[in-house]
């Protein structure tokens, strides 16, 4: 049986503490970069070869050749945001098809979820 080392980067704030940028710095040292939970709410801006990218769903290891990137079971994907992000990366020459794996159990945010969420927040009022 092969055993390997696994490092996990966790955020213990509200999710906006800069994990994405830290992961981007660390990705050259790892073979697999995986998101295991979270959604597309914050995003992180990265610069790669002089171009700026905003990643909200796709792991930043996508910029490193030969790395496997995984979107895991606990990730919440918004298909419209994900597809926009993927198209922007592919237009810039980044190969997602051979380096990005998405769990069949990843959750989806559908337009109805956003409408319902907005209605619930509106019903709460300002307090």
What residues fall within each predicted segment?
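Non-transmembrane, aqueous-exposed alpha-helical and coiled segments at domain scale
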Residues: 1-127
């Amino acid at each position: 049986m092969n055993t390997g080392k696994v490092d996990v980067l966790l955020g213990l704030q509200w999710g906006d503490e800069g994990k994405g940028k830290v992961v981007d710095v660390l990705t050259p040292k790892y073979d697999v970069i995986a998101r295991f939970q979270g959604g597309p709410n914050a995003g992180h801006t990265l610069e790669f070869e002089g171009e700026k990218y905003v990643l909200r769903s796709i792991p930043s290891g996508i910029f490193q050749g030969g790395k496997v990137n995984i979107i895991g079971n606990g990730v919440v994907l918004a298909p419209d945001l994900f597809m926009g992000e993927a198209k922007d990366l592919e237009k810039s020459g980044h190969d997602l098809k051979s380096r990005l794996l998405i769990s069949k159990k990843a959750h989806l945010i559908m337009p109805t979820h956003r409408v319902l969420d907005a209605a619930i927040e509106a019903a709460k009022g300002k307090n």
